[in-house]
């Protein structure tokens, strides 16, 4: 063989080797993305999967509706409160290591939730699931963003799409599993899937170097999480048939102390969890405040409709889960359509329109008789949630008002915390007051809770409209224009 032919053969073989290596790396990235998407799906499913199972959990532990709210709020409060620090921990200890620990904690807590002998241990397990979410989700999103050198945000967008599917899928899975097996399996089913994710991460994700140079503001994160937990506990205690007033008042005072201490810590620490100057922008402040109120109404609607369909309408868990599918699809539809609406009438117009139209609908929904048909139970809910989701997406855009590259991560983290903590606090406060014999009076508990949620929506609309015209909500794209 000539020297030229031999050289050509070597070059050809090297090219094939490089192509094979690149194909193998591409397959590895896709497999990694799939398994990380499975983890995101589990986290998203766990937000809604407990809804249909709530009556079964209540009957299993013989607790009332007010105590039942902890099963939902425990997960979202801890997850939302620690989410801000999750990304910093991933930078400090490495994304791979943080993801492994967070996923393991989520899986172990799912096992504890499925085997919980009483409500107290179930709530503690839900706390653990929330902490696992707060650690694993930012690490997973960071790994996916870094896995593609050409389009890092495409993976993150796919992850967001998976989350939307998970929210809808949670309703259906909850109904099927609760009726055919047991409510415990809505948690136990996570274990084999989390195990697959752990094995995939160990085999496919390379060890990464730590990138953080600044310490984690752990005191700020703990105070930020403790304040809403103490608030919820105090309100729930006030709603008891025989409330322990010293404990309730002490919890509410402790919540106020934690909130004040959080502000003090953030002022003094060199590397705050949330720089207080971030809230100097009134538009961002109003957008996040309105998000809290809107998420409170949205989560309360899901909670109350679950109880209404299975208690008042006497639907089976599967039937209730199927009834929720149109509601979940209306949320996805709103996310698709709201972009065009924002381009036509602006972020302020979309936010106000969504919330203002949802407020009266919330009041009408509260007045539906208990013997109304399934169509009149679900269809108004579809319209209500479609409008509320429109307002929520518009507020999410406004929460990024005037953000720079340096504080973009803080802005998105604060917005997500406002969403999760608002939803948890809304369920706790509105439902506790509505179903309390002392606070709700002789009114129908559903009517009271829905009405309080509607009042919150009206307050959010007024807050947005109170901004001066030059400070009206604007999405990042509108600012550039």
Curated annotation (Swiss-Prot):
CDD domains: MFS_MMR_MDR_like (cd17321). It is a multi-pass membrane protein. Pfam families: MFS_1 (PF07690). Its main location: membrane. The lineage of its organism: Bacteria, Bacillati, Actinomycetota, Actinomycetes, Kitasatosporales. GO terms for molecular function: transmembrane transporter activity. Disulfide bonds: none annotated. This is Lincomycin resistance protein. PROSITE patterns: MFS, SUGAR_TRANSPORT_1. One of its GO terms (biological process) is response to antibiotic. It comes from Streptomyces lincolnensis. The keyword Amino-acid biosynthesis does not apply. GO terms for cellular component: plasma membrane. The chain crosses the membrane at residues 30-50, 67-87, 99-119, 127-147, 162-182, 185-205, 215-235, 245-265, 285-305, 318-338, 340-360, 374-394, 421-441, 446-466. It comes from the Bacteria.
